[in-house]
Amino acid sequence: VATYNVVSTNGAATLNDLTFTVAGSGVESLTIGSVTAPSVGGTVNFYGINLSVPAGSSGLNIPVAVKYSAVTAANQGGVASDSVSTTTLTSVKYTAGGTQTTISPSVAANPMTLVASLPTVKKTSTGVSINSGTTTNVKIGTMTVAADAKGDVILFQLPYSVSASNVIVKANGTDVTQISGVASATSTVFSTGYRIGAGNTVTFDVYGDVVNGGSNSSNYDVSLGSSANFKWSDVVDSLPIGSAKTGTLLTTYN
């Protein structure tokens, strides 16, 4: 949903018609309130919408809901994964003081990158208290990766930081990574991809040997690495790791 704010500074006004221009592919229609208008040739027209804009600096917020086409494999004739679409308000006809006027703004909503599904990535642990000395094979922290209900995702690389040695990462209880020696900033890499089913969540637990050189207990935990180093794909792509998507556009990566 994109929200447009319209202000009328010289008395109240009525928005009669609105026109939006759609760049890119994938937009089927826009909806304002209970009115839905289709995209025809990259243009969406709302005629006779008659929205009242009060006088003053607060104006009127207009939520515009966008319906996108499904993302499918290239040979299925749908919208390609990673297609980018932008919706721009390009014409406003309004009435104020008995006079009807048409203006041509260019107010674009944020561009949207379309995918078949997407992951939610979280660090869910709060750390573990380690006594002075060496503790071996202790569970240090936990991360989760969940696939959206709309489709499977493929995980290629999960970046994280941890202060430990002989690190083992378990996915839902099964070993998937073993790192001998000291590990700090590192990643669990799945060269052929780790598939997560639609609506499912995989828990990644990080174990390792921890040396606390102090005289008191200290808290140790894992942290997520840079979202730019998180590698994934929707199943539509089936891409190798070198061309996978990153986590920079994910709505939840924390």
Label each residue range with its predicted role.
Residues 1-254:
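Exposed, polar/acidic Ser/Thr-rich sequence context and nearby capping/turn residues
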